[in-house]
Amino acid sequence: MRGAAPTVADLNLELNDLVLPANLLSEEVLQSSDDEYEITEEESVVPFRIDTCCYRCEVAVRITLYAAELGLRTLEQLLVEGKLTFCCTACARSLNRNGR
């Protein structure tokens, strides 16, 4: 706007050059969704053990897995929210007829 008494004609509505497309700073690069789940050399896979109980019969269940940090955080979130539970091999056999 210019002048002591601004008017509608003084407004500059061409703001496209002032807006960053995705809040990228310091030459950051957007990754496609396919690249998000690839494990890079920098992101190492580590062993992780979970001791819990069966959802159905409450017998002790121990699971060892290998995952990257992002995978472990996602798993932890699912477990804490109750969206993921484990079952023992005996319950799995009786429920799923040996996986068939």
From Swiss-Prot:
Keyword Nucleotidyltransferase in record: no
Pfam families assigned to the protein according to its UniProt record, in alphabetical order: E7
Cellular compartment(s): Host cytoplasm; Host nucleus
A single GO cellular-component term on record: host cell cytoplasm
Record's keyword terms, sorted: Activator, DNA-binding, Early protein, G1/S host cell cycle checkpoint dysregulation by virus, Host cytoplasm, Host nucleus, Host-virus interaction, Inhibition of host innate immune response by virus, Inhibition of host interferon signaling pathway by virus, Interferon antiviral system evasion, Metal-binding, Modulation of host cell cycle by virus, Oncogene, Transcription, Transcription regulation, Viral immunoevasion, Zinc, Zinc-finger
Domain of life of the source: Viruses
Residues passing through the membrane, by range: none
Ranges spanned by the short sequence motif Nuclear export signal, renumbered to the chain: 72-80
Example GO biological process: DNA-templated transcription
Residue span of region E7 terminal domain: 1-42
InterPro entries xrefs: Papilloma_E7
Keyword Glycoprotein: no
Post-translational modification: Highly phosphorylated.
Positions annotated as zinc finger (unnamed): 54-91
An annotated Gene Ontology molecular function: DNA-binding transcription factor activity
Chief location: host cell
Record text on subunit structure and interactions: Homodimer. Homooligomer. Interacts with host RB1; this interaction induces dissociation of RB1-E2F1 complex thereby disrupting RB1 activity. Interacts with host EP300; this interaction represses EP300 transcriptional activity. Interacts with protein E2; this interaction inhibits E7 oncogenic activity. Interacts with host TMEM173/STING; this interaction impairs the ability of TMEM173/STING to sense cytosolic DNA and promote the production of type I interferon (IFN-alpha and IFN-beta).
Note on domains (UniProt): The E7 terminal domain is an intrinsically disordered domain, whose flexibility and conformational transitions confer target adaptability to the oncoprotein. It allows adaptation to a variety of protein targets and exposes the PEST degradation sequence that regulates its turnover in the cell.
Classification via HAMAP family: PPV_E7
Family statement: Belongs to the papillomaviridae E7 protein family.
Function: Plays a role in viral genome replication by driving entry of quiescent cells into the cell cycle. Stimulation of progression from G1 to S phase allows the virus to efficiently use the cellular DNA replicating machinery to achieve viral genome replication. E7 protein has both transforming and trans-activating activities. Induces the disassembly of the E2F1 transcription factor from RB1, with subsequent transcriptional activation of E2F1-regulated S-phase genes. Interferes with host histone deacetylation mediated by HDAC1 and HDAC2, leading to transcription activation.
Descriptive protein name: Protein E7
Species annotation: Human papillomavirus 4
